[in-house]
């Protein structure tokens, strides 16, 4: 799983680890996919709305800025139960209030 993988100014130190994470997930998916094991790579490009996160990261942001944990869990559940004929690998989640 990944928190963010897009390039961003002043975040170059973070980019190499995220690229490595994605490539590792691809390798695992190719190794285990033929055995019927679905590997998906999730990018959660958002501040996740928790009691601790909101006051620390963005106390003045509206609700639309945050990803809700139940919505993230629903999407992960949906992907985990996909038909093998239409498996997703890379799934990006972000709230509509996020600037990207």
Language-model region placement:
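Catalytic loop of short-chain dehydrogenase/reductase
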Residues: 3-20, 26, 30-33
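Active-site segment of SDR-like NAD(P)-dependent oxidoreductases
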Residues: 4-6, 45-48
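Short aromatic-enriched loop/helix-cap "lid" or pocket-rim segments at secondary-structure transitions
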Residues: 10, 51-55
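A general structural signal for well-ordered alpha-helical segments in protein cores
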Residues: 21, 25, 53, 72-73
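Short, functional N-terminal and low-complexity linear motifs
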Residues: 21-23, 38-47
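C-terminal helical subdomain
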Residues: 34-37, 41-43, 55-100
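A short beta-to-alpha transition loop/helix N-cap that caps and shapes the active-site region
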Residues: 49-50, 100
């Amino acid at each position: 799983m990944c928190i963010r993988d897009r390039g961003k100014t002043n975040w170059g130190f973070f980019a190499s680890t995220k690229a490595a994470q994605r490539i590792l997930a691809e390798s695992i998916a190719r190794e285990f996919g033929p055995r019927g094991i679905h590997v998906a790579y999730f990018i959660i490009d958002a501040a996740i709305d928790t009691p601790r996160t909101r006051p620390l990261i963005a106390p003045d942001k509206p609700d639309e800025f945050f990803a809700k944990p139940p919505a993230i869990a629903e999407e992960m559940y949906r992907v985990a139960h996909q038909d093998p004929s239409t498996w997703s690998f890379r799934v990006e989640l972000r709230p509509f209030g996020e600037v990207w």
